[in-house]
Amino acid sequence: MLKRTEKHIARKNNLSIFYIQTEDLPGQIGTIGCIFGKHNITIRNIEFINEKKDEEVLIKFAVKMPSDMSKEKIMDELQRVNGVKKVTGQ
């Protein structure tokens, strides 16, 4: 969960937050980044939150999205990436 200050900063900077639980695969960050890039979404921050197992990792992405972009559409596309277990957003 974001701390109160982080939530304020995200809102002030018009950032969206995505949490992605994924298998720890070579190139996985690049694959996710390509999806964001394809939709003109700029990654502002990446944070590795938790490694539950050696094979999985929870990654928090803070991104700047175009105003007409549907967050649900991006979440659906990210969910289809090989190795991604769960995608949530704030």
Features from the language model and the residues they span:
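Short cationic amphipathic helices and targeting signals
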Residues: F18-I20, K60-V63
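Short amphipathic alpha-helices in soluble, non-transmembrane regions
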Residues: T31-F36, S70-G83
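Helix N-cap motif at beta-to-alpha junctions
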Residues: L25, K64-M69
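General secondary-structure edge motif
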Residues: L15-S16, L58, S67
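Conserved short beta-strand edge segments in small beta-sheet-based binding/regulatory domains
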Residues: R44-E47, R80-Q90
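Long, continuous compositionally biased terminal/linker segments
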Residues: V63-K64, I74
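Canonical alpha-helical transmembrane segment with a positive-inside/aromatic-interface signature
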Residues: M1-F48
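A short, glycine/Asx- and small/polar-enriched loop/turn
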Residues: K52-I59
